[in-house]
C-alpha cells in the first residue's frame, strides 16, 4: 500500500525554505517526498492562474539533482501532467523555453551554495514566480502519493533554442579574431557555451573542467580563481575568460589580463550597449550607476532577482528599454530590444550569456579593459563568512541599528563615524571617508555577506577583509 502525504505537513517539517531565489536547503532534507510536495504545491498554484498540460524540467550538475528531478516528474505524472525533461542545461535556457512554450518550469539547482545543499527554482509560464506565489506554495494543503522514481528521457530542444536566441542576432561571426577561454568547472552550460562561442567565430580554449561539483560563487571569487585567471590569460593569450556559477545564470568574465569584472560593472556595460532607458538594480550595486547619469532612471531594490523583476512593472509604464542587473552578475532583460535590427525578446530572469555577448560585441574592436577604464573610478568588493546563522547575522545588524559606536568598534572601524545608513536589505553605511560597508545575511545559505565600495580596488578589498576578520575574531572563529 502506498503512503499518502499531506503537502502542508511535509513542507513544515522539511527544513526547506524559500531564499533569495528558489527553495533551498540541505540535500538530506530534499527527500523524494519533499520534492514531490513542492512540485504538487507549485502545480496547484499554477493551475489556479494558468492553463497548461505540460511542465518543463531541468537540472544542474550536482550529484543530487537527478534524483530530485525524478521525484518532481513522478509527482507531476501522478497529477496527470506531462514532463518535458531537458537534462543538464543553464537555468535561463530552461526559462527561455518555458516562456516560449507558455508552460511552467522547475529547475533543480543549488546554484553557488555549498555542496551539501540543493534547491528548486520555479517558473510561471510568464517568468519567475513572485514572492506572493512563494507564499501561496508553502500554504497549499493537498494530498499526494509517495513518488515512484523512473528514468527520464532528455530533450535537447531547450539547449538548441537558447543557442539560437543569441547566434541569430549576429549575421557575421564578430568574434572571428578573438580567443575566449571557457572556465568550465561543473557549470550546467559548459558544453553549450563552447558551441555558441565557436558559432560566433571565437577560438575557444577549454579550462579546468571538473568531474566533481564545484560551487563557484560569482560574488565571492576565491583567491585561487583570481590567480588562475591571470595565469590562463597570459598562457593562452586570451581576449576574455567566460564562466558562470553552477546553474549558468550568473556570469563571471575576465578581461585580457585575467582580471575578473565585478558583476555590476558587467551589467552596466551590457545595459549601455543595449541602450537601456532605465534599469533596476539591488542596493548592493556600485553607487556610480545611480550617480553617473548613464540612464534616464535607476530603481534600487532589495537583493534578489524577484525584487528586480517586481520593479520592471513600474519601469515599463514609463520607459521603452528596461533591464536589471545585480552585483553577482545576473542580468535580466525586462523588455524586447533590437540588436542589429533583429528582435531579442525579453527574458526576465538571470541570464549569464547576454551580458557576456554584449560585452564582447562592444569590445570587438578594442579590449575589455579599455571599456572598463572609461567608467568612473569607483570600486566594489564582496566576500562572505560561511556557517553563520541568520540569527547571528541579524544580531550584528541590530547592533548597528541601536548603537553605531559599538557597531563600528565591532567591525574594526571605530576611528570613523557614520554619515548615512540604509536598511533596504541588511545594514549599509557610508562612513566619513565616503567608503561604503554593507552587511546582510545570505538568503540562500547560512552565510554573512559583506560588500564594500571605495575609490580604489585595494581599499574595497581591505574593507571587506577587515570587517570579516574582526567579526570572525569576535565570534571565536579566528
UniProtKB/Swiss-Prot annotation:
What general EC class does the enzyme of this chain belong to?
A: isomerase
Compartments reported by the entry: Cell membrane
| GO MF assignments | magnesium ion binding; phosphoglucosamine mutase activity; phosphomannomutase activity
Asked if the Swiss-Prot or TrEMBL record annotates the protein with the keyword Transmembrane, the reply is yes
Secretion signal: which residues?
Answer: none
Q: Which residues form the active site?
A: 111 (phosphoserine intermediate)
Which UniProt keywords are present, listed alphabetically?
Answer: Cell membrane, Isomerase, Lipopolysaccharide biosynthesis, Magnesium, Membrane, Metal-binding, Phosphoprotein, Transmembrane, Transmembrane helix
Q: Name one GO biological process term.
A: GDP-mannose biosynthetic process
Q: Which reaction does it catalyse?
A: alpha-D-mannose 1-phosphate = D-mannose 6-phosphate
Q: Which cofactor does it need?
A: Mg(2+)
Cofactor note (record): Binds 1 Mg(2+) ion per subunit.
Q: Which residues cross the membrane?
A: 30-46, 265-284
- Note whether Phosphoprotein occurs among the keywords: yes
Cysteine pairings via disulfide bonds: none
* EC number annotated for this UniProt entry: 5.4.2.8
Where would you say this protein principally sits, based on its record? membrane
Q: How does it sit in the membrane?
A: Multi-pass membrane protein
Q: Under the cellular component aspect of Gene Ontology, which terms does the record hold?
A: cytosol; plasma membrane
Pathway named in the protein's UniProt entry:
Nucleotide-sugar biosynthesis; GDP-alpha-D-mannose biosynthesis; alpha-D-mannose 1-phosphate from D-fructose 6-phosphate: step 2/2; Bacterial outer membrane biogenesis; LPS O-antigen biosynthesis
For the ligand (Mg(2+)), the binding residues are: 111, 245, 247, 249
Q: What does this protein do?
A: Involved in GDP-mannose biosynthesis which serves as the activated sugar nucleotide precursor for mannose residues in cell surface polysaccharides. This enzyme participates in synthesis of the LPS group C2 O antigen.
Record's family? Belongs to the phosphohexose mutase family.
**This protein's name:** Phosphomannomutase
Which organism does this sequence originate in?
Answer: Salmonella muenchen
